[in-house]
Amino acid sequence: MIHRFSLTVQLQRPWIAWALPQFRRQKRRSQGNQLSGYRLLSQSSARTRDEPEIFRGNLNVPVANCSEKYFDSQPKAELKLKEYLQYMKQKDRQDTLYLKDWHFHAAQRLQQPADPPVYRTPCLFASDWLNEFWEEQPELRDDFRFVYVGVAGTWTPFHADVFRSFSWSANVCGRKRWILLPPGEEEKLRSLSQLPFDVAGVLGAESPSAAVSSATLPAGVSVARLQPKTSPGGVRYFDVIQEAGEVMFVPSDWHHQVWNLRDTISINHNWLNAANVGHASRHLLASLTAVKAELADIADGSGAWLAQCQQLLKATHGMDVREFVELLCFAADRRLDGARGAAAVRGLDGWQHSRDHLRWDLARVRCVLRRLLALEDVTRAPDMDECLARAQRVIADIEEVCPPEAGGAPGPGQCDCGVCA
C-alpha cells in the first residue's frame, strides 16, 4: 500500500495527491488557482498586483525539441518566453518544443527580489535540504525548483531523477501521463548497458487508454491499492494519468517517463531530506566508482588524478563529494539550534519543523557523515581539509544534542541510510 508521508517511514511508492481523502475533499472545494488545498498564487499576486514582469516574456527560457534525439536526451536551445508562447499559439508546428527545467523561482528572485513568491511549496514537501542549501547561495543563481510548459505531445524521456532525489510535480493545468518502474525493474530493459530512450514501445504500452486516472476510477476504489501492470517481457510498471490540480510524488530510484496529453503547465521540485539521503549517498559513491573506472588507464593515485575524478563526477553527476558533505553540514547547522530549543527552524517557503523532526534530521545527517568520513574516497578527495573539519564538528554537535544512547541516532541494525553496513 502507499505509505502516508512520515519522517520515519521511507516512501516506497509513487502517489498522486488525490489518493488522500483530505486532498480529494479540498480539491472539490478548490478553484483553478488552488492545488490540492495549497494556493499556487498568493492573494497579492492573484488580486492586487499587475502581471509580474517575469510573465511579460522577455526572459530567456530553456526549450527542448521533443522531435529530435541528442545522445540520450533531447536537444535544447534558449528562446524568449514570448517566442515560446507565440509558438504555442501556432496551428501548424514544425517541431514539438517543450519549455522545461525553467528555474522559475530563481528567476523571480533575481528579477523581482522584493516580490512574494508566485507559489508556496506544499507542506508535505517542505523538508527539502537540497533547495534550502541553494536558497542560501543566491550568487549561484541555481536551484532544483522548475516550471514546465508544454503543448500536447511534448514528453520527457525515460530517466531517474538527479542525485536519486525525490521529486514532486504539480499540474497547474493540463494532463500528464506517467509510466513509473519500481527500483530494479529498469534493469530488465537494459541492452548493451543502455536503457531505452522511449519506454512505451518496449513495454507494449504505446496507447494511454489503459492508464489509470482519478477521473475514471470506480467509486470506492483507492489509488493506494492499485497494482502494477506487467509487460510481455515481465517488467512491472505503473501507468497513471495526472489531472489538473493533482500532485505526483516520485520516490528515489523510480525510473519514469512523462507525456503531456494536453497543453500543460506544471511546477516540479527535486528534493533531498532525511528519508532519502541514503539513496543520494549511495548513488554519489557509485557514480564516483564509475568515474574512477573510466579514468583507470591514467590512474596513479596522485592528487591531480583524484582532482580529475572529482571534476568528472561534478560534470556527470551534478555534485562532487565536497559539495555533498557541505550540503549535509548545512542541513545540520540549521537544525542544531532548533533541536536545542533555541530557535524555530523553518523549511522551504517558511514551513516550521517540529523538534522531533529536527532530531530525526540530525540523526540521519550524523549517520551518513560518520560513514562517509570512514571512506578513503571521501577523505582523500582534494580540498577537503576544511570541509572534513566542519563535518567532524557537526558530528560532535549532533551527538551532544542527540546522544545515540538516548535514541537520537539509529542503533545497530536500525539504520537504512544506504551507506551503513
Kindly give the residue locations of the regions a language model identified.
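N-terminal accessory scaffold of Fe(II)-dependent oxygenases
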Residues: 1-247, 259-421
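Short, charged beta-turn/beta-strand-edge "cap" motif at the junction between a beta-strand
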Residues: 254-256
